[in-house]
From Swiss-Prot:
GO biological process, one term: tRNA modification
Residues holding substrate: 4-9
Names of the cofactor(s): Mg(2+)
Entries under InterPro entries matching the protein: Dimethylallyltransferase, IPT, P-loop_NTPase
Protein name per UniProt: tRNA dimethylallyltransferase
Pfam families documented for this protein: IPPT
Domain of life of the organism encoding this protein: Bacteria
Amino acid sequence: MGPTASGKTALAIALVEQHNCEIISVDSALIYRGMDVGSAKPNAEELGKAPHRLIDIRDPAESYSAADFRTDALQAIEEILAKGKTPLLVGGTMMYFKALLEGLSPLPAADDEIRKQIQIEADTYGWNHLHDELKQIDPVSAERIHPNDPQRLSRAIEVYRISGKSLTELTKIKSEPLPYDVVQFAISPKDRKQLHLSIEERFKLMLNQGFVEEVRSLRERSELHIDLPSMRCVGYRQCWQYLNGDYDYDTMVEKAVVATRQLAKRQLTWLRGWPELNWLESGSDSNLTTVLRHCR
């Protein structure tokens, strides 16, 4: 695991070439078909060397939750173990890792009618008004959910209206944790400036590889819109807005790079509090040897 642009995929492929393991992707963008360039999806050559499970398993118009991931990942783990191989989970979607390792809380399924009502209230009174409501029913969640985060804010209120219990109450109840021994590694540059540089260079490479054209093709599909989870992936949202005419090309690039840096910061915040984690430095020649030592 590790922040975006830290070298996870390259190390994982090197591990597959040296050890009897099989990769399971832990990435909420790689699950979507047709979102290849902007998600830094492994290319055909890389997939030929090291096939990845749980990529290209959903259309961008479809939803996919942490619960869906846990179900799919557990099945993939069992299948890989049955072949006498080691499952190698690789990615940066920390909520997926957490769901797999710790289990999930029994949260109610989404209710379209309640969501529509919440959206109407937001359009009428504003998200700050709904955030004030959340402070009354779930102050702990209100403390960590920003008023400018409508997806999470709406979900917290929706959970309470469906169940009569706060998100904080329900998340204290967990299902069974992962029934396997796990060795965990995080890879990241020691220097934050180096990570920021890698992020900027990778986004410029994506642009040269046809990222704008990829998003333009997605926009042509009538069932896709900017508020879908798939289109909220970093880079895609900013490019979609650029194609809408919301701002110029240079501003799009700047906003996408900033959004990706913010994602990396959130990922690192998760990882700094992660238990039983072995840290690797991006680009270090000893990374492969270090991981293989734990595999034998």
